[in-house]
Amino acid sequence: MTAPWQKSFLAFAGPGIDHPSDALRVTDSEAADILSTLAAQTWSAPIPARLARQPGYAICHACDGFNTALFGPDGIVGFYAGSYLWIAGAHRGKGLSTPLILAAAERRGGSILPPGIVLQGYTPAGLAAHRKAHHQAILEATERVIPGRVRRPGAIDFVQLRLAGATR
């Protein structure tokens, strides 16, 4: 299985990166419909260490299919379901999108595109979140191979030059 850091950003996120649009935002009513479907699914045990810096949250994969959910104290507060990424308003801005995106990508073979999907759209904010997640995956991989390297000035430039396709 390929890890997210082993893919170019284009392979990680798909060709939809070229045309972000706010029209692609998941509304709260759309999210409510998806949440009702997700509530009926059986979930895996929480993924260890993915949310180490965000206590009170857990990420789990659906036992069937490729959905990934972010659980808070009161149940699902975010998801990557199909090609839809959403986090409830009260939980945004807490650094939760990066671990959710990376967990979904790991489940899907290194890309966030679910099986059978070749094009996925993004809002500008969603595209930025996916870029941040992809960079984070590369930095984590680099830190495992070259401890201390990512803490040096210009680390992301080094990573982009040395590892396959951190840019488009």
Task: Please tell me what each predicted stretch does.
Residues 94-99:
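Glycine-rich phosphate-binding loop
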Residues 1-91, 102-117, 121-127, 135-168:
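Non-catalytic substrate-recognition and accessory regions of acyl/acetyltransferase enzymes
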